[in-house]
């Protein structure tokens, strides 16, 4: 979340940034934050003054008694009692103001960087780069859900029977392809210096608040009400929360972690042709990169992550493009985000397969993730993460873009992992 110092020192810039994200009532909300913070500070000032007076009077009472000034001592005792009673009310008032302030800050998104373009939604995102070769498919090319049925790779109906829509069952070479991609992505991450983590896929509320999924995405997360736990929408949540309430040594940075997990998203309100097959699922596999770094290095770290994801798509021989997201299309927590999309020749549309984001200090402030400098100062870290990669749409694109009259060709980079060159 934003720090009070950010808001008080750069009030106008913060409001402009929130308006770029199309955050409703930005000015009014920030004014409410400042008012609540002033109330908390003013109450604290009065409380501190009262506590100082109580300490002073308490010390004087003993001296007055020794000097035989019983009336003055009694007056001092009565004043101490009055102040203590008043301080109880002041403490409650200050605690309430602090709670109100914290709850307000939780509802405010991160401020986008100046390099983030203006815009309302996906149509305003800026194409930064395009790569890969366009695929020439047979005239009777099929979308992946029909290919999955033809080659008995994925059973969507069986998933509906077992669980419901959005929970496919992978079979045979479909399951092998899924596992091959996971291992390929993890191996590539390790080659790039990432440490593999195997985290829980269920987290508590504090973890959800730490990375910003709560309260913003509460309705999109599966909630186990009996135990008050949440199924993770991304490995970002448990992996980043490893460093909640941690002060790192400067020499430990950067931290580079990767994790493969199942991810769970309710995707409430998603209907229509864009959700067919693997395009939008409630449960899916994903490999995530998480980095923690010093502020002065996070721009370089972000670029390294972008290069890593681009390298994966190149090795998979997929046509792709990189988008710089506009303010209105960015996530609640991101300060800067790039999306990677692969082109589906069979569906004639672009499919998002990765988002790579820099969160500046926004998550770190929530998490209290800090580092100690050589000068013994404690500073907030920068956190970054990105999908490398999300599997469903990658599988969809691989099936569709590599279909031939003989079957589905496997990219060379994956053959050592699949053990086969063709699905037929």
Residue ranges and their predicted role:
Residues 1-135, 153, 157:
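N-terminal alpha-helical targeting/anchoring segments
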Residues 27, 129-424:
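TRNA-recognition modules of translation machinery and tRNA-sensing kinases, especially anticodon-binding
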């Amino acid at each position: 979340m934003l720090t009070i110092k950010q808001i008080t020192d750069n009030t106008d810039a913060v409001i402009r940034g929130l308006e770029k994200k199309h955050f409703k009532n930005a000015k009014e909300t920030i004014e409410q934050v400042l008012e609540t913070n002033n109330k908390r500070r003013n109450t604290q000032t009065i409380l501190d003054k009262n506590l100082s007076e109580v300490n002073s009077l308490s010390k004087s009472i003993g001296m007055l008694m020794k000097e035989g000034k019983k009336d003055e001592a009694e007056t001092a005792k009565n004043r101490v009692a009055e102040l203590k009673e008043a301080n109880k009310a002041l403490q409650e008032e200050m605690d309430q103001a602090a709670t109100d302030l914290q709850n307000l800050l939780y509802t405010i998104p991160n401020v986008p960087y100046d390099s983030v373009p203006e815009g309302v939604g996906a149509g305003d995102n800026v194409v930064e780069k395009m790569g890969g070769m366009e695929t020439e498919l047979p005239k009777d090319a099929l979308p992946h859900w029909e290919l999955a049925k033809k080659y008995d790779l994925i059973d969507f109906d069986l998933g509906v029977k077992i669980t419901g829509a959005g929970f496919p069952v992978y079979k045979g070479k479909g399951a092998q392809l899924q596992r091959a991609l996971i291992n390929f992505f993890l191996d590539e991450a390790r080659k790039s210096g990432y440490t593999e983590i195997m985290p829980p896929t269920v987290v508590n509320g504090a973890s959800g608040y730490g990375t910003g999924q709560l309260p913003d995405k509460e309705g999109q997360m599966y909630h186990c009400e009996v135990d008050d736990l949440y199924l993770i929408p991304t490995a970002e949540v448990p992996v980043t929360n490893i460093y909640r309430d941690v002060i790192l040594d400067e020499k430990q940075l950067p931290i580079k972690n990767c994790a493969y997990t199942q991810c769970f998203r309710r995707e409430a309100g998603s209907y229509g042709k864009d959700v067919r097959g693997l395009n939008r699922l409630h449960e899916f596999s994903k490999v995530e990169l998480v980095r923690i770094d010093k502020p002065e290095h996070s721009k370089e770290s972000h670029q390294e992550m972008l290069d890593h994801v681009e390298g994966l798509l190149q090795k998979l021989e997929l046509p792709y493009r990189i988008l710089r997201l506009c303010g209105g299309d960015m996530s609640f927590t991101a300060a800067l985000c790039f999306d990677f999309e692969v082109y589906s020749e069979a569906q004639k549309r672009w499919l998002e397969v990765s988002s790579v984001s820099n969160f500046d200090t926004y998550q770190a402030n929530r998490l209290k993730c800090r580092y100690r400098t050589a000068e013994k100062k404690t500073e907030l870290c920068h956190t970054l993460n990105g999908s490398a990669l999300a599997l469903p749409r990658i599988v969809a694109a691989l099936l569709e873009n590599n279909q031939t009259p003989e079957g589905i060709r496997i990219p060379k980079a994956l053959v050592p992992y699949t053990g086969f060159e063709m699905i037929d």
